[in-house]
């Protein structure tokens, strides 16, 4: 019998140390169980025609001590049978991932962006029972599309404690003509440094109640953030001022260095695994050519900087010059940054606080890209349209999703084309994520995305083909917003 569902069991994953064989992680208390609105608690059964697994991995989720650059954080992480929690596969592979929970509380794994069958989606109380301490669970699923993905816990605030790692799926249709390739994981970090994510949530939810400056319905301000406003996203881009921002698990003063040769063609796969931070990414002295977002190819677009919200991924290519170059990810609205170095020559590395023209350029919003022809969904008129209103405020700290004016799930029938009209009625940006499907954005020529950033006051139209039966989570990928109510689902009738 499946346990009752709790929004605090829906939190997404954290931070990976790509190539180091360890993944940082921690967890918040999943909290008391409470039924999700409209949840059937009956996942669609595992398909019988998956075939034998072609990629097998074993993971243990356990407490560990993480060195983020001369600073030890006692946290939680994934320990892999291969020594590296990152998983690589090829489109069409069948994965079997066996996880044993050595944590003191229940956990789960969600395979972010993968259009897998419902029973493997990793949402406790909706698609599976929680994996209790001492228990094991096997996830078996096909990866149908190539691209940059990641996996993470979907239990409590384990997102902000780092239980996550990259999942890279090779696409036989990609050229794969790069000389070097790096996976770049961006994260915000507090666990084991200044308390825990639960402590941060307690601060937010304990700020008081009622209207603030007459803006209750529009998400009034008054929280912990006092960063410099961003000219594209505004100043209220997050709720938590973290002590550290990381690239591949390292703080700026103990940064990662990526080495190549002058003239090399590099492919960089960026993943924002943060819980509350939108990053603006730039590489000093270079323009980047965007080739994919959220796993799907796009029409190549050259840019100097890119906004990457929580849960989004983007692939870029760049021809590397001769020298030592800063790779900087500004924490938008927080007056801080993550930092690494790309080196193709000897010499002194730049200081982490270095500013450069690309960093101050107008950043690219990924929703403005156009899809490659092979990523397009067939054009058609929607069979059903639902109105999605995003609401909430800081005081009291509460967030919500209303579907057609009700706090209930969106519904669809298999085979239908569903149009979701999302309206952000708050003063904050929200990265909205759909499980089990990938949207096509009509306003961007059919761009394929599973995570879309809605700026304050923005309306975005997103279509999907209902070809994957079950009940699927739909939520804000800001962990603190989802934990306090910005969560719903898409349910097949």
Language-model-derived ranges and their functions:
Residues 1-5, 16-21:
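N-terminal secretory signal peptides
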Residues 12-13, 19-22, 27-58, 163-207, ...:
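Extended terminal and domain-junction accessory segments
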Residues 51-56, 71-73, 104, 179-181, ...:
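Sequence-level motif detector for i,i+2 pairs with an aromatic at +2
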Residues 53-174, 277-306, 326-335, 384-412, ...:
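Histidine- and aromatic-enriched segments that form or immediately flank copper-ligand environments
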Residues 185-262, 271:
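Acidic-aromatic/histidine active-site loop/patch
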Residues 272-274, 283, 320-322:
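A generic beta-sheet turn/junction motif
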């Amino acid at each position: 019998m499946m346990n009752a569902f709790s929004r605090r069991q829906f939190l997404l994953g954290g931070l990976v140390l790509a190539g180091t064989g360890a993944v940082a992680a921690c967890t918040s208390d999943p909290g008391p169980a409470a039924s999700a609105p409209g949840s059937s608690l009956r996942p669609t059964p595992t398909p019988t025609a998956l075939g034998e697994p072609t990629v097998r991995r074993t993971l243990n989720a356990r407490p560990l001590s993480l060195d983020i650059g001369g600073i030890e954080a006692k946290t939680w992480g994934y320990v892999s049978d291969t020594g590296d929690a990152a998983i690589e596969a090829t489109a069409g592979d069948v994965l079997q991932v066996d996880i044993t929970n050595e944590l003191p509380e229940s956990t789960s794994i969600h395979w972010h962006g993968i259009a897998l069958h419902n029973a493997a989606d990793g949402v406790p109380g909706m698609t599976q029972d929680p994996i209790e301490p001492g228990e094991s669970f096997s996830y078996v699923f096909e990866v149908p599309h190539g691209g940059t993905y990641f996996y993470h816990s979907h239990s409590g605030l384990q997102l902000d404690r780092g239980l996550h790692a990259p999942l890279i799926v090779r696409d036989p249709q990609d050229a794969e003509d790069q000389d070097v390739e790096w996976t770049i994981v961006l994260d915000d970090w507090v666990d084991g440094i200044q308390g825990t994510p639960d402590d941060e949530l307690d601060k937010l939810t304990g700020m008081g109640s009622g209207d603030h400056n007459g803006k209750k319905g529009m998400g009034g301000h008054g929280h912990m953030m006092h960063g410099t406003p961003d000219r594209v996203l505004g100043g209220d881009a997050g709720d938590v001022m973290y002590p550290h921002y990381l690239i591949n698990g390292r703080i700026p003063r103990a940064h990662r260095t990526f080495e190549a040769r002058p003239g090399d063609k590099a492919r960089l796969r960026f993943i924002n695994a943060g819980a509350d931070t939108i990053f603006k990414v730039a590489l000093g002295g270079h323009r980047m050519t965007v080739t994919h977002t959220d796993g799907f190819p796009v029409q190549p677009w050259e840019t100097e900087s890119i906004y990457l919200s929580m849960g989004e991924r983007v692939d870029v290519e760049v021809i590397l010059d001769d020298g030592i170059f800063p790779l900087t990810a500004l924490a938008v609205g927080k007056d801080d940054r993550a930092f690494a170095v790309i080196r193709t020559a000897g010499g002194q590395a730049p200081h982490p606080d270095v500013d450069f023209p690309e960093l101050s350029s107008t950043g690219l919003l990924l929703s403005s890209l156009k899809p490659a022809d092979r990523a397009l969904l067939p054009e058609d008129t929607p069979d059903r349209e639902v109105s999605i209103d995003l609401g909430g405020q800081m005081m009291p700290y509460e967030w919500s999703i209303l579907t057609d004016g009700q706090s209930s799930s969106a519904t669809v029938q298999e085979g239908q084309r569903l149009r979701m009209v999302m309206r952000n009625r708050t003063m904050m940006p929200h990265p909205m994520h759909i499980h089990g499907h990938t949207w096509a954005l009509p306003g961007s020529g059919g761009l394929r995305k599973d995570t879309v950033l809605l700026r304050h006051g923005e309306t975005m139209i997103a279509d999907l083909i209902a070809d994957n039966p079950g009940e699927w989570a739909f939520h804000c990928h800001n962990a603190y917003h989802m934990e306090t109510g910005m969560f719903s689902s898409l349910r097949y009738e």
